[in-house]
Amino acid sequence: MCGFIASFGQNINHKGLKIAFNQLQRRGPDAEGIWKKDNIFLGSRRLAIFDLHDRSNQPMTSICNRYVLVFNGSIYNYLELRNYLLNLGIKLRTTSDTEVIIELFVLEGPKMLSRLQGMFSF
């Protein structure tokens, strides 16, 4: 099971976040990633299940570079959703469920949540 941490606001405690992030190490032994911008911090520890390549590490940025996602869980219908995106001509870079989620969000916004079947958090 992966693990992630997120923080945003005026007074981000970077020392505290680093301690918390390190506590997640056992949750994701395959990769770790951090994304910071202004007053936003996202960190991810990955247990690779789908697409074992580095290209699927998190935090993941959307193709348009507007959105960044950290995700944990399993989307049971992600192959169906992936095919939907491909049929629309979206050129996915990975075979990961994470990219399917973020690109579906780019396309449909929050209403895409009703299309996800599984157990997940992001």
Label each region the model flagged:
Residues M1-F122:
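N-terminus-centric sequence/structural signature that marks the extreme N-terminus
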